[in-house]
């Protein structure tokens, strides 16, 4: 199965879930106390996401495919142990050094790390889904459905709980949602893979004769080089997490922002990251697996063609162009439509607390994070041990600088400083990653200008920015639904015309559109 087909399944699977979650969040912002949202969406969610990221990242990206399938499976089942150890450390840090423990009960606080541990039990199935490409696309669909279900179940439970248990404390409702979502996700993975193995419906899973082959066999042991690779990647993951969520750590362990301001920042970030989570994250996940599997020539567990570097370079070039165009489109339409989106999504809470400015800045962040996701995935897959060690030192230095910049800019710019700090951080990482890619590919390295839209698309984007900025000043600043709808309608026309021109005249997108059309006909 091609990388493009995997991406289609992943994006399509998560798109519906993100739309449902987005709609429910619109309601929750108007129904739940701002301080509760600040606690849950920033401090407690950071605890949960830190545990999951540090558990998942090493296993999904490290070079752990080394010839022995049982040893590979044994290594994957270290994920619950790793998650438990990380949870103990993180809970201590949150309890001792943040103010979260003063505002939530132990039962609520522990629900987030415990749910992360439950989800980590299903991590072996997720890694297998990412590492094995199925010709029929079932594994790509499985991963996308699982991630989408995890998102939806939690939000739907909270929404239903508000009506079914109106007297329940909202923090407890979020805690129960964590458990329900994690258990549903775990059961989905177990049941689905049991059916896959029993029915032998997926060719890549035929090497597992029984369902028990997916579980550890202690007599086989674990490959030492793979363990070393995981722990090396783990150290990188700690630094990457600090770089990725530096603003959330500053908010959690300092008192620079009130819980209300934290809720506003998180809500804006959720709106701004809808493109990141729905489109760019699935692209990153599939491309990271593709680059890792293709570049690692010594892998013999999976039957991969790892010799065709021309295809590798071509794929890198095309993916960079796709995410670059997506980022520029987000910038173009994000700036003039930020006030409208903020008003519709969060009402007065966001509109009256600088939400429009934050979302406009976030539009620029989307562009740099889109490029960084691809360049970093390729760079990490191509690094040898010496380069990985050097990269670790780079991340260590930049993570410290990033936290300092976050703190300083927050003092002077409030929450807007976090987004500016993230843009600076991502830009520096892109420069470092591109240098690594150039060293690996040499003369075959594509030009970095591949991220830019074509000249014709750039003209359409420029005209769209001017037109929508004018209509914002003309219509959106005037109270009244009809004026707002006029502003939205003109933007929709500009977006459709830009998309149509890009699909017809941009060679990369022309191939994508033709592939989608052919797949639909088949």
UniProtKB/Swiss-Prot annotation:
Domain of life: Eukaryota
GO cellular component: endoplasmic reticulum membrane
BP GO terms, sorted: dolichol-linked oligosaccharide biosynthetic process; glycolipid translocation; protein N-linked glycosylation
Coiled-coil region(s): none
Signal sequence segment: none
Intracellular or extracellular location(s): Endoplasmic reticulum membrane
Keyword field contains Protease: no
Transmembrane segment boundaries: 35-55, 75-95, 108-128, 143-165, 177-197, 322-342, 354-374, 400-420, 457-477, 479-499
Annotated membrane topology: Multi-pass membrane protein
Chain's role: Intramembrane glycolipid transporter that operates in the biosynthetic pathway of dolichol-linked oligosaccharides, the glycan precursors employed in protein asparagine (N)-glycosylation. The sequential addition of sugars to dolichol pyrophosphate produces dolichol-linked oligosaccharides containing fourteen sugars, including two GlcNAcs, nine mannoses and three glucoses. Once assembled, the oligosaccharide is transferred from the lipid to nascent proteins by oligosaccharyltransferases.
Protein name, per record: Man(5)GlcNAc(2)-PP-dolichol translocation protein RFT1
Classification lineage: Eukaryota, Metazoa, Ecdysozoa, Nematoda, Chromadorea
